[in-house]
Amino acid sequence: GFEYSDAYLPDNDARFVFQFVRSAMDQGCVAANYVESLGAHRVGDLWITLARDAINRETVEIRAKVLINAAGPFVDEHNRLTGEQTEHRHLFSKGIHLIVPRITSNRRILAFFADDGRLFFVIPMGTRACIGTTDTPVESPYVEVTEDDRRFVLENINKRLNLPRPLTSSDIIAERCGVRPLIAAAKADGDIRDWLRLSRRHEIEVDRVKAHLSIFGGKLTDCLNVGDEISEIVAGLGIVLPRQDSRWYGEPHRSVCKDYLRQAERMNLDSYRSSEAAESLTDRLWRRYGAKAFELLEAIRQDPRQAESLIRGTEYIRCEIEWAKRQEMIVKLEDFLRRRSEIALVMRREDIRNAAGLMEACEIL
């Protein structure tokens, strides 16, 4: 055997991305969610994008010197709206994961080779385990989990682990499904012989005359490097980037963390830890909120009820719900349950619906 080490996301990818968005906003960035582009055109030295609020359906024009198409699997679709011709395009691979009760008390990731030859993982998620994945060619980024997907994952895990009883569909708590945008030449036909060898790397295409950038492929693992490349290209197009060398992401200085830990210990913060929690309250608040966790500590000092778990069966406390309302751009309940937290990924839908405190959380949000 061998041991391989890598990074992992304690919450989920959506929370990971939002942390970047929130940090950028704290540094002066303007961001909006539930806004869709209806297309863009060039007028003189400016791009004019027609955008629509997906909630109230109102439209607005956004003017910009540079247009960056960072739409992920929808890059090609948006380029068609703007009339951009590129050397690359995306092909899509669908991947799914199933969330089931914890399989082993070991916190290490288990890795196997599935029947199709690709790596297959069991990833610990507190009291749950995330198993998968699949790699299925699809035509569209709009995908969902099928019975064949579930059968493939369950059969592979049951073949490779000696479980007290085989996992069945009744053990599935939640599901994850999405596509990997893989890079192909724009003129390549759809008959790709070696699907697993398609590149997971990223490519940035630049139209310097129109000041238009398209980002193809890539992974979250490399997102900061992609951002650095984009910044260099935009600066090369004559756009002055303020505070380009500032550190706007990541943990605060270690001295800030020490001060937080000292305050948390003095107020005996971990005595409020709920039985459902997979980690200490001290660790979780720091990991999720960084220096902003001081505000949560103060809320708990002022009113100890703020440390109560609000939604029964989850580890999220009352002051976190209040914080999410003010700071985390919650528009729909699903934003909180699935994107800002992992509640919808570790609890069955019917358990969430019937959880004590859910309605109060909805009123707060």
Give names to the regions the model predicted.
Residues D13-Q19, S23, R80, Q85-C130, ...:
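C-terminal catalytic lobe of FAD-dependent flavoproteins
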Residues I55-V66:
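Core beta-strand elements of the Rossmann-like FAD/NAD(P) dinucleotide-binding domain
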Residues G1-G28:
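Rossmann-like flavin
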Residues D45-T49, N106-R108:
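Short, hydrophobic/aromatic-rich segments at coil-to-beta transitions
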Residues V30-A32, I173:
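General small-molecule cofactor/ligand-binding pocket signal
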Residues E3-Y4, T49-D53:
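Short beta-strand segments that buttress and anchor functional surface loops
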Residues N33-W47:
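A conserved short coil-to-beta-strand element within the FAD-binding core of flavoproteins
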Residues N69-E84:
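Flavin (primarily FAD) binding-site architecture
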